[in-house]
Every structure is written in C-alpha cells, then in structure tokens.
UniProtKB/Swiss-Prot annotation:
Pfam families: ATP-synt_ab, ATP-synt_ab_N, ATP-synt_VA_C. One of its GO terms (molecular function) is proton-transporting ATP synthase activity, rotational mechanism. The lineage of its organism: Bacteria, Bacillati, Bacillota, Clostridia, Eubacteriales. Keywords: ATP synthesis, Hydrogen ion transport, Ion transport, Transport. Gene3D superfamilies: 3.40.50.12240. GO terms for biological process: proton motive force-driven plasma membrane ATP synthesis. The gene is atpB. InterPro entries: ATP-synt_VA_C, ATPase_a/bsu_AS, ATPase_F1/V1/A1_a/bsu_N, ATPase_F1/V1/A1_a/bsu_nucl-bd, P-loop_NTPase, V-ATPase_su_B/beta. This is V-type ATP synthase beta chain. The keyword Transport applies. Belongs to the ATPase alpha/beta chains family. Produces ATP from ADP in the presence of a proton gradient across the membrane. The V-type beta chain is a regulatory subunit.
Length: 461
C-alpha cells in the first residue's frame, strides 16, 4: 500500500520539498494530486533524513501547499518499449504525440539504463554510410561510435541531422537498421520540419521520434535523451538492430541542467553550469557502443550549438573529452553557400581508420583521404597567401592547389541536403579532384593505387 503525504513544505520553481517522508529512494517516481484532482509527476532528486526534494515534470503552477497530496510510487521513471514504437512520434516523456494509440509494451525499462561493462564492449570497426562525402570520405562514422556535430546558431544542423537520419545505413549487413531521433528543447517549426521530413521521405517507418518543445518544462528536457537511449538499447540489444541515435540540441539539455541546478542553489561551476556537467553528459554518451555476443549496436550523433561559435565553451569542450571526435560546421562555408558547411580540417573521427579499407569501403580509402586532407590544407594556405601578397606571388603549383581548394569545397563538400552519395561515388569524386594536381604532388598515395585509380579518374573527366 502506497503512503500518501500531505506534508508539502515548499515549492520553488520546478522543485518541491516534502517533509516527514519515510522509505523514499533516490530517483523514485512521484505522483502529485492537486486540490482540483489534476495529477502531475515528478522524481526524487535528493533525500535528507525525513525530507525529500522532488523535481516536477509539468511545472509547479497551481500547486497549493495544503491541498496537494504526494505519493511515492516505489519505482524510477520508466519507458514502455516495443517494436511497435518504430514509425511513431512521442513527446519528451514517452507519451504518443502523433494521435496514434498508446503502445502496448513488451516490458518497461528504467530510463537511466545500466552501465555497459567495459570488458563486455566490442570494438567499433564497421563502416556506416551516411551519404555525406565530408563524413564518409574524410571523417568516417563507425558502428558503435559517438561522433558529435558542433554547430552554431543559425547554421543548418537540423537539415544535416534529417539528411543523415534518412540516408544512413550499414554496408554489407543484413541486420535491420533503425534511427532514434531526440529533439530537445526545439521550436515548434523545427519539430514540425523533422516530422514532415521523416514522413515525406518514408524514413519514419524505421524511426522513433521523441520531441521535446522549447515551451515544455525544463525537467522534461533532462528526461528526453534518456527516453530515446532507452528505446535504442531495447531495439539494439534485445531486437538485434543497428540503431543510430541522433540527439539535437545538447546545448538545450545543458541549459535545463543549469536551470535545475540554480533552483537547487548548488555551487555553480564554469559559466554557471553545475560541477557535475561532465559526469552527467557521460551518462548519455557512454550508452553508445557494441556488446560482445550481441548483434545490435548503438551509434550516437549528438548535435550541439556552440554559444558564440566558441569551441572552448564548457559544453563542446566536455563533449569532446567524452566522445570520439567531432564534425564542425563552418559559418564561413555557410556564407559561401556550401551545403552542408562541414569544415573538414578541424573535424575529426578518432575511429575512422578502424572502419575503412579493403572489405569495408575500398583499399585506396586511407591514402585518398590523407591526400585530400593534405591538398586542401595546402590549397587554403595558398589562398590566404594570395590575399596578403597577391596572386602573382604564387607559384604555378600553388595556383593549382588554390584551384583544388575551391573545387574541393564546391564539388566534394557541397552536395546539398538531398543528395545521397555512395562511398564509391565519394572516393571516385576524390580521385577526380586530385587530377587537378600534378602526379608528382600526390605523395601520400601508393604507386599501385595511382596506377589503378588515377588513370580512370582522368578518363572520366
């Protein structure tokens, strides 16, 4: 029999203090009944002797200290999971948002998940084709990896996220592929864009969407990515699917953490964020991976907007420590009309060498990638030099490198948000661009690959 408490002592913002409690545990789900019969939910955030601090999911407006009844339900916040979730849209707390019926769950799972034993982890080494050349060719995504996208306010990260969700697939695998998409603190227009894009392209059939709007309570924002990851773990490790989890925008999640931390009067850390921000983010990112003996996997692409495009801001800074690289969107490329505006030089995938090569992509992938990086870097350097000294100061070779850099941005990086390139098309395009340079400059590619692929590229020009 659940006890009912009428000892609400204080309500401050999204927090409520309940006095004289007994047998209450951390993270326990709470039901609050208002004087008018309305029911709201919360969870236990802190326990101090006979006092419990409760975090409210639906806000505190209208709560009467004397009339409110509080029940501690003896279980954490859970998500009912089933394969029927595919093709559906939910709110940030896992309730259907698309007008469809409630899901009849196979089971209910704690949204906080269970840490993966490091010894049980399998190493990520399978290529995932996103259809985006700047990622597939140069900063390869590998199954089980966590690869964030660092964006800026106003840059088209939403379009890139939708494109990857539509196009991503594991090559040479018969296993089912699913996408779990979590929109955190998004505007109504952006949420509708995602829903419409998934529906029109048919991507909704293999996807689960969790949408938390900007006007939803901050507490719901903290639960939304955990809801998405719980659904992903079920599909991956119990149904054997390859699951790609895309979470946007992690910055909104961190702002919600800061809001709750301030309401609790905690000592702030860097820029007002709680001191446990690193630990909290790791509880999200570390739920990606592969497990020995399990066919399925979870690959993560968290997307965050860097305040003032600052890479040293605590959110991108700490995210970079936990994840395995970063894809950086450039405002300069965006102004040039390069879409998607991925800046390949500061971008990095730390596991890219594990997912490429013979039997995975193509034998020449690593050499081509190294040569493209080198040539583009030299081309940018030549262009910067011409701005300072004038084009006449450049050697003939420097001019070719500058020409290569322009062609690389316009043809390789820029492909729009609807073009889906195979890895073969991406690699062949790289070879085609390298024909701009003299053969003597292609020092990072083995002779056998030059003989095999360069002549083909020259013929196709």
């Amino acid at each position: 029999m659940l006890k009912e408490y009428r000892t609400v002592k204080e309500v401050v913002g999204p927090l409520m203090l309940v006095d004289q409690v007994d047998g209450v545990s951390f993270d326990e789900l709470v039901e609050i009944e208002l004087h008018n019969g309305e029911k709201r939910r919360g969870k236990v955030l802190e326990i101090n002797k006979d006092k419990a601090m409760v975090q409210l999911f639906e806000g505190s407006a209208g709560i009467n200290l004397k009339g409110a009844k509080v029940k501690f339900l003896g279980k954490p916040l859970e998500l009912g999971v089933s394969e029927d979730m595919l093709g559906r849209v939910f709110d940030g707390l896992g309730n259907p948002k698309d007008g469809g019926p409630k899901i009849i769950p196979d089971k209910k799972l704690d949204i906080n998940g269970i840490p993966i034993n490091p010894v049980a982890r399998n190493y990520p080494d399978e290529f995932i084709q996103t259809g985006v050349s700047a990622i597939d060719g140069l900063n390869t995504l590998v199954r089980g990896q966590k690869l964030p996208v660092f964006s800026g306010s106003g840059l088209p990260h939403a379009e890139l996220a939708a494109q990857i969700a539509r196009q991503a697939k594991v090559l040479n695998s018969d296993s089912k592929f699913a996408v779990v998409f979590a929109a955190i603190g998004t505007t109504f227009e952006e949420a509708q864009y995602f829903i419409d894009d998934f529906t029109k392209t048919g991507a909704i059939d293999r996807a689960v969407l969790f949408i938390n709007l900007a006007n939803d309570p901050a507490i719901e924002r903290i639960a939304t990515p955990r809801m998405a990851l719980t659904a992903a773990e079920y599909l991956a490790f119990e149904k054997g699917m390859h699951v790609l989890v895309i979470m946007t925008d992690i910055t909104n999640y961190c702002e919600a953490l800061r809001e709750v931390s301030a309401a609790r009067k905690e000592v702030p850390g860097r820029r007002g964020y709680p001191g446990y921000l690193y630990t909290d983010l790791s509880t999200l990112y570390e739920r990606a991976g592969r497990i020995l003996g399990k066919e399925g996997s979870i690959t993560q692409i968290p997307i965050l907007t860097m305040p003032e495009d600052d890479k040293t801001h605590p959110i991108p800074d700490l995210t970079g420590y936990i994840t395995e690289g970063q894809i950086i969107l450039s405002r300069e490329l965006y102004k040039k009309g390069i879409m998607p505006p991925i800046d390949v030089l500061p971008s990095l995938s730390r596991l890219k060498d594990k997912g490429i090569g013979k039997g995975k992509t193509r034998e020449d992938h690593a050499d081509t990638m190294n040569q493209l990086f080198s040539a583009y870097a030299q081309g940018k350097q030549a262009k910067e030099l011409s701005v300072i000294l004038g084009e006449s100061a450049l050697s003939d070779t420097d001019k070719l490198y500058a020409k290569f850099a322009d062609a690389f941005e316009e043809e390789y990086v820029s492909q729009g948000f609807t073009t889906n390139r195979t890895i073969e098309e991406t690699l062949n395009l790289g070879w085609k661009l390298l024909t701009i340079l003299p053969k003597s400059e292609l020092k990072r590619i083995r002779d056998e690959y030059l003989e095999k692929y360069l002549s083909k590229a020259e013929e196709s020009k």
